[in-house]
């Protein structure tokens, strides 16, 4: 089974949000820093980016939320949330996010984990 990763434009996030919200809220429940409503608002604003990893059966296996941040001397891509099921089928797509971040001018990746 193949999987693909899709980055959603801030204007399209609300359309696909129902596919991601449950996984994202579960991740937020363990994080405590924000909830799914906060993530949705930040994605719609363009502050956060929403990625979905889907299988050729249209099943959503994972949701990833990133944020590109500018520090005084470096631009970084933070992976704020990575949540899903059957990670061996999709975890390799994190490399796709890293490649995208490099295209955005990011020199470094930062990952938040519990």
Model-predicted regions and their roles:
Residues 34-39, 63-65, 95-97:
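Residue-level detector of functional hotspots within protein domains
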Residues 1-34:
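Short amphipathic alpha-helix that is part of the acyltransferase structural core
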Residues 11, 18, 37, 41-44, ...:
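Polar/charged alpha-helical tracts
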Residues 72-114:
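Acyl-donor binding region in acyl/amide transferases
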Residues 47-88:
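Conserved donor-binding loop and adjoining core beta-sheet/short helix segment
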Residues 28-50:
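Active-site rim helix/loop that mediates acceptor-substrate recognition in acyltransferases
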């Amino acid at each position: 089974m193949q999987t693909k990763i899709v980055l959603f434009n801030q204007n399209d996030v609300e359309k696909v949000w129902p596919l991601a919200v449950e996984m994202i809220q579960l991740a937020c429940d363990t994080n405590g820093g924000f909830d799914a409503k906060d993530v949705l608002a930040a994605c719609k604003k363009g502050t956060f980016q929403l990625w979905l990893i889907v299988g050729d059966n249209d099943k959503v296996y994972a949701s990833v939320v990133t944020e590109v941040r500018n520090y005084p001397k470096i631009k970084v891509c933070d992976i704020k949330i990575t949540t899903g099921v059957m990670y061996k089928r999709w975890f390799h797509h994190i490399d796709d996010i890293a490649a995208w971040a490099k295209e955005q001018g990011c020199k470094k990746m930062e990952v938040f984990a519990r």
